[in-house]
C-alpha cells in the first residue's frame, strides 16, 4: 500500500515522507518540477532498508530536479515569493475517516500563517477529475490484478467443501495472490450461511456447512492498482433450488447493469435502474409484491427494495478500491467501475452478491472479469 496514492499517481514515487512540487510557470526551469526525498543513512539502511537515491528517483519519476527534504523549507520560501496562488492537497475522499490531524493539515495551517496574503486553493477536485479516467497502462494493471484474482477464485472453488473454515479459504486466496506477486486489495469478506448477509463481514472464522452459500468478496491488487470481485458459491458444490433462483436473479441484474454503463449516464440514474431491476426480481422471488413496484417515495432510501438491496450498485476502482471521482458527473470513456448487485435474505440465511470490474468505452462496456467463472453451472463444474 502506497503512503499517498495522489503522489504516486503524479510521480510514480511510493516512498514515505516524499514531497512533490509542480510550478509550471516558475522563472527557473529547474523549479518547475521538483521532488523532495528523505535523505538516507547507514542507520536507516540497516533498520528500514534501501531508500531511493536522487538518480533512482529521477529514473522512476522522470523528474530531474530531486532534492532532500532538508532543503524543502528554504526552497519553498523562494517559490512563495514568486507565486500568487498555491494549490494544496488534502484527503478529500468521501469515505475517509480522519480523527487525527494529518501532516497535510498541519502544513497547510503553517503555510497560511506564514503567508496570509497568498491565494490558497484545493487541488483535490482536479485530482479527482484526472484519476477517475484511466489511461491504457492503468487499465492493463487493473487487468493483471483481475487475472490474479481469477487464479485465487478458481483455487478456492477447488478447495471449498463442507467443514472448511472461512479462515482456511482466506489462506488459500493469500497463497495464490502472493505467489503471483499480488496482495489483497482490501480486507477479504468470506461469509458462509448467515454471515453472507453481513455486508462487511470480516471475522472470517466460522465453519462452512453443507447447504450454506459462501459469499466471497475478495480480490487482488497489483503494482498498487486494485481489482474488486464478489462471487457466491455453494459450500456443498451444488446450489439448492432456492439458492439457484436467487443467484440467477442477481446475475440477470449484473448483466443488465454492465450493459447500462454508458458514457453520459449519471451514477444516480444507473443506481435507480439497478434498484428497479432488483425490485422486479424480488417480486419473482416472493420477497416483494407487484404493488410494491408502484410505491412512490420522496426519500430513495425508503423504497421497498431497500430491504433486500441496500447499498450502491458500484463505484470507480483504481489506485483506491473506492477510487476518486465526481459521482455527480456523467460516466465517461476510461472510467473503470465495479458492478455489484445483490439480494440479501437474512430470514433464509441466504445472500447472493456478484461483482465484476468494467471499463467504460465509446463502443460499449468491457468486462475486465469476463473470463472469471460466474454462471452457476460454471461454478458447480469447478467444485466437483
Protein language model annotation of sequence segments:
Residues 1-384:
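Active-site neighborhoods and metal-handling regions in enzymes and metal-associated proteins
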Amino acid at each position: 500500500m502506497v503512503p499517498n496514492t495522489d503522489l504516486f499517481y503524479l510521480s510514480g514515487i511510493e516512498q514515505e515522507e516524499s514531497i512533490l512540487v509542480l510550478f509550471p510557470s516558475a522563472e527557473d526551469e529547474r523549479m518547475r518540477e521538483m521532488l523532495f526525498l528523505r535523505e538516507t543513512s547507514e542507520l536507516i539502511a540497516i533498520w528500514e532498508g534501501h531508500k531511493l537515491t536522487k538518480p533512482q528517483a529521477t529514473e522512476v519519476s522522470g523528474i530531474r530536479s530531486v532534492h532532500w527534504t532538508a532543503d524543502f523549507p528554504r526552497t519553498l520560501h523562494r517559490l512563495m515569493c514568486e507565486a500568487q496562488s498555491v494549490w494544496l492537497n488534502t484527503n478529500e475522499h468521501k469515505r475517509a475517516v480522519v480523527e487525527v490531524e494529518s501532516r497535510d493539515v498541519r502544513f497547510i495551517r503553517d503555510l497560511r500563517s506564514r503567508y496570509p496574503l497568498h491565494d490558497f486553493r484545493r487541488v483535490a477536485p482536479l485530482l479527482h477529475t484526472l484519476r477517475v479516467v484511466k489511461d491504457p497502462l492503468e487499465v492493463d494493471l487493473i487487468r493483471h490484478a483481475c487475472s490474479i484474482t481469477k487464479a485465487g477464485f478458481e483455487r478456492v472453488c477447488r478447495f471449498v467443501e463442507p467443514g472448511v473454515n472461512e479462515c482456511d479459504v482466506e489462506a488459500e486466496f493469500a497463497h495464490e495472490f502472493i505467489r503471483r506477486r499480488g496482495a489483497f486489495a482490501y480486507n477479504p469478506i468470506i461469509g458462509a450461511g448467515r454471515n453472507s448477509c453481513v455486508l462487511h463481514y470480516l471475522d472470517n472464522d466460522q465453519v462452512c456447512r453443507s447447504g450454506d452459500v459462501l459469499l466471497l468478496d475478495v480480490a487482488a491488487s497489483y503494482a498498487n492498482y486494485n481489482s474488486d470481485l464478489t462471487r457466491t458459491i455453494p459450500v456443498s458444490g451444488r446450489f439448492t433450488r432456492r439458492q439457484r433462483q436467487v443467484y440467477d436473479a442477481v446475475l440477470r441484474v449484473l448483466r443488465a447493469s454492465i450493459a447500462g454503463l454508458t458514457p453520459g449516464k449519471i451514477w444516480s440514474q444507473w443506481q435507480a435502474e439497478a434498484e428497479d431491476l432488483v425490485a422486479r426480481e424480488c417480486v419473482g422471488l416472493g420477497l416483494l409484491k407487484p404493488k410494491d413496484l408502484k410505491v412512490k417515495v420522496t426519500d430513495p432510501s425508503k423504497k421497498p427494495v431497500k430491504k433486500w438491496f441496500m447499498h450502491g450498485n458500484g463505484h470507480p476502482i483504481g489506485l483506491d478500491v473506492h477510487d476518486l471521482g465526481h459521482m455527480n458527473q456523467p460516466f465517461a470513456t476510461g472510467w473503470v467501475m465495479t458492478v455489484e448487485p445483490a439480494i440479501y435474505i437474512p430470514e433464509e440465511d441466504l445472500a447472493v452478491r456478484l461483482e465484476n470490474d468494467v471499463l467504460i468505452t465509446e463502443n460499449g462496456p468491457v468486462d475486465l472479469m469476463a473470463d472469471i467463472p460466474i454462471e452457476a453451472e460454471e461454478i458447480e463444474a469447478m467444485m466437483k
